[in-house]
Swiss-Prot record:
Organ and tissue specificity: Expressed at high levels in kidney, liver, lung, brain, and testis and at low levels in heart, spleen and skeletal muscle.
Gene responsible for this protein: Pex11a
InterPro entries for this protein: PEX11 (IPR008733)
Gene Ontology biological process terms from the UniProt entry: brown fat cell differentiation; peroxisome fission; peroxisome membrane biogenesis; peroxisome organization; regulation of peroxisome size; signal transduction
Name of the protein described by the UniProt record: Peroxisomal membrane protein 11A
Subunit structure comment from the entry: Homodimer. Heterodimer with PEX11G. Probably interacts with COPB2 and COPA. Interacts with PEX19. Interacts with FIS1.
Primary localization class, coarse: membrane
Coiled-coil blocks: none
Pfam family, one: PEX11
Induction field: Induced by clofibrate and di(2-ethylhexyl)phtalate (DEHP).
Cytoplasmic topological segments: 1-93, 239-246
Lipid bilayer topology: Multi-pass membrane protein
Keywords from the UniProt entry: Membrane, Peroxisome, Peroxisome biogenesis, Transmembrane, Transmembrane helix
């Protein structure tokens, strides 16, 4: 109950909760559409999905300011790669939210003469750039942590006097096993990095589908959005699990 109250008291938390509901409806609708006798349920899910999506617009109006603040914070990062990636990513997020606000204004009749399709594609393009740059930052962090895990393991093996248990061998299978083990240990050591990587990877399926770069069905987009929303909710409930800039 305390966790729910904490989420409900934050605009970002409410947005993530609504987003999880929206994508859960999308996923359920995909699973039920092919089943006979479920037409009424599918219609209700579609209506709920539309209502939740409309409700989210009110929370997202303030996200432009939040994205600007995030851009200012990312400029102060000490590591060059995260600073560059996060600054460019957040600038694209600012433009995305501006496009989203224009689309919202068009949908409620506050403005006219707006080409909806053009603005939707513009928003999807900047959302894609934001997520792509965020994933580049995640990859950089993963590689740094993998290097640290490899160095720590080498020190332990050297101090114990035991022969190395894993090495980059000539055989491809052994190399792959060593790489996957390093990756697993790196993400296990750093839950915030794991959550951020999962969230961004699942989210990028949405603009990839919208831009036609990689077409997915409704079920894949709904599942990806749901997983991403749950990961985002976890960071709202437990702020210590949010990935910090170096």
């Amino acid at each position: 109950m305390d966790a729910f109250i904490r989420v409900a008291n934050q605009s970002q938390g409410r947005d993530r909760l609504f987003r999880a509901t929206q994508h859960a409806c999308m996923l359920l609708r995909y699973l039920l559409e092919s089943k006979a006798g479920k037409e009424a349920v599918v219609t209700k899910l579609k209506n709920l999905e539309t209502s939740v999506s409309t409700g989210r617009k009110w929370f997202r109006l303030g996200n432009v300011l939040h994205a600007i603040q995030a851009t200012e914070q990312s400029i102060q990062a000490t590591d060059l790669v995260p600073r560059l990636c996060l600054t460019l990513a957040n600038l694209n997020r600012v433009v995305y939210y501006i496009c989203d606000t224009v689309l919202w204004a068009k949908s409620v009749g506050l403005t006219s003469g707006i080409n909806r399709e053009k603005w939707q594609m513009r928003a999807a393009r900047h959302y894609y750039y934001f997520l792509l740059l965020s994933l580049v930052r995640d990859l950089y962090e993963v590689l740094l942590h993998m290097g640290q895990v490899a160095r720590d393991r080498a020190k332990r093996e050297k101090s114990s006097g035991d022969p190395p248990k894993y090495s980059v061998a000539n055989e491809e299978s052994e190399w792959l096993q060593s790489f996957l083990l390093l990756l697993f240990q790196s993400l296990k050591r750093n839950p915030p990095l794991f959550l951020d990587t999962v969230k961004n990877f699942c989210d990028i399926l949405i603009p990839l589908n919208q831009l036609g770069i990689y077409k997915s069905n409704l079920g894949v987009v709904g599942f990806g959005g749901l997983v991403s929303s749950v990961a985002g909710l976890i960071t709202v409930v437990y702020p210590q699990l949010k990935l910090k800039a170096r």
